[in-house]
């Protein structure tokens, strides 16, 4: 039995809502994957805040129709498409997909869209090579902490250096007085 018009409208509304929350959309060719493999992919993507949607290209086309941000996605709507809709951590999501691809060797990444720009496979791989959000925050925090430590050491060094200079002058004067007496 086919889908009713009401059911299709619900699917399109759900796609629009998910796209509205997403920063990146990837399109993969999923033909040949079993239900268990799709479930495995979804489990791998879940920690990164990514949703895997398997839907008809025409329904996705209707969902992106009024949103300029996702218009380039229409070029990728052909064949058996699964859509990876990434909400936050795109680097982790891409890495999770790449790990899945290494294991199954059954999917093909067609491309993606981010901020209204069409991404080809090399672009997506470059995004996957970026550090995750947590790693970037750790690197920034480490850099800020190192800078603060250097400033604190520098500030503490000024009075210490001044004290050593004064002590050297005092020792020199005392040493000069001792030889004169």
UniProtKB/Swiss-Prot annotation:
Database matches in InterPro entries: Ribosomal_uL10, Ribosomal_uL10-like_sf, Ribosomal_uL10_bac, Ribosomal_uL10_bac_type, Ribosomal_uL10_CS_bac
Xref: CDD domains: Ribosomal_L10 (cd05797)
Gene Ontology CC terms, in alphabetical order: large ribosomal subunit
Alphabetized Pfam families for the sequence: Ribosomal_L10 (PF00466)
Cysteines paired by S-S bonds: none
Domain of life according to the entry: Bacteria
Claim: Ribonucleoprotein is one of the keywords in the record: yes
UniProt KW Secreted keyword: no
Example GO biological process: translation
Gene3D superfamilies in alphabetical order: 3.30.70.1730, 6.10.250.290
Example of a GO MF term: large ribosomal subunit rRNA binding
PANTHER family, per the entry: 39S RIBOSOMAL PROTEIN L10, MITOCHONDRIAL
Cited function: Forms part of the ribosomal stalk, playing a central role in the interaction of the ribosome with GTP-bound translation factors.
SUBUNIT field: Part of the ribosomal stalk of the 50S ribosomal subunit. The N-terminus interacts with L11 and the large rRNA to form the base of the stalk. The C-terminus forms an elongated spine to which L12 dimers bind in a sequential fashion forming a multimeric L10(L12)X complex.
Similarity remark: Belongs to the universal ribosomal protein uL10 family.
Protein name: Large ribosomal subunit protein uL10
Gene, per the UniProt record: rplJ
């Amino acid at each position: 039995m086919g889908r009713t018009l009401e059911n299709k409208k619900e699917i399109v509304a759900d796609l629009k809502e998910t796209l509205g929350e997403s920063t990146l959309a990837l399109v993969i060719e999923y033909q040949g994957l079993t239900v268990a493999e799709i479930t495995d992919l979804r489990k791998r993507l879940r920690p990164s805040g990514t949703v895997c949607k398997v839907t008809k290209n025409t329904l996705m086309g209707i969902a992106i129709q009024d949103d300029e941000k996702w218009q380039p996605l229409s070029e990728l709507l052909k064949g058996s498409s699964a859509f990876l809709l990434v909400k936050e951590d795109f680097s982790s999501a891409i890495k999770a997909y790449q790990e899945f691809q290494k294991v199954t060797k059954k999917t093909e990444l067609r491309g993606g869209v981010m901020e209204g720009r069409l991404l080809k496979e090399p672009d997506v791989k470059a995004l996957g090579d970026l550090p995750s959000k947590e790693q970037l925050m750790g690197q920034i925090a480490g850099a800020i902490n190192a800078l603060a430590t250097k400033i604190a050491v520098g500030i503490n060094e000024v009075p210490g250096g001044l004290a050593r200079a004064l002590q050297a002058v005092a020792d020199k004067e005392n040493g000069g007085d001792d030889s004169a007496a």
